[in-house]
């Protein structure tokens, strides 16, 4: 039991200037709030799960978007501001954190009372998760 915090796509490829799908300077303004959410959940002993964009070079998503967040590259890593926090990391290949991942099983195992979801690109990956 307990609660779960899902942190979606707070990765270098979206959050650091100079990358193909950088979400812009305004996106960085959410970092302190995300950190506070993580700290609050960890203080209460809740689970924190980081869901991170991580693609293969031939991913179908690249038919719609420029190549980004390739598996094993810096772009697919959590931003430095979040790397010191404990939590499980789930790489994803599509908008939804549930597509071909074990997120559903993890949530079933935890059986949370409440799931809080946060992250960048709320109109795409956060919404689809």
Q: Can you describe what each PLM-predicted range is?
A:
Residues 1-89:
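Active-site acidic carboxylates
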Residues 11-12, 55, 94, 122-124:
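Short, glycine/serine-rich, charged loops/turns that create anion-binding
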Residues 72-73, 79-123:
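Internal catalytic-core helix/loop-beta-alpha segment
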Residues 126-129:
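Short Gly/Thr/Asp-enriched flexible loops that form oxyanion-binding sites at enzyme active sites
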């Amino acid at each position: 039991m307990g609660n779960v915090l899902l942190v979606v796509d707070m990765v270098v490829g979206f959050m650091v200037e100079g990358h193909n799908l950088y979400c812009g300077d305004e996106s960085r303004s959410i970092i302190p709030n995300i950190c506070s959410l993580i700290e609050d959940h960890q203080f209460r002993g809740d689970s924190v799960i980081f869901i991170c964009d991580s693609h293969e070079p031939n991913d179908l998503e690249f038919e719609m978007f420029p190549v980004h967040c390739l598996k094993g590259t810096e772009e697919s890593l959590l931003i430095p501001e979040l790397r010191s926090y404990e939590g499980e990391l789930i790489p994803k290949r599509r908008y939804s954190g549930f597509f071909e991942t074990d997120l559903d099983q993890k949530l079933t195992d935890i059986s949370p009372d409440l799931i809080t979801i946060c992250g960048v690109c709320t109109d795409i990956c956060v919404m689809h998760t």
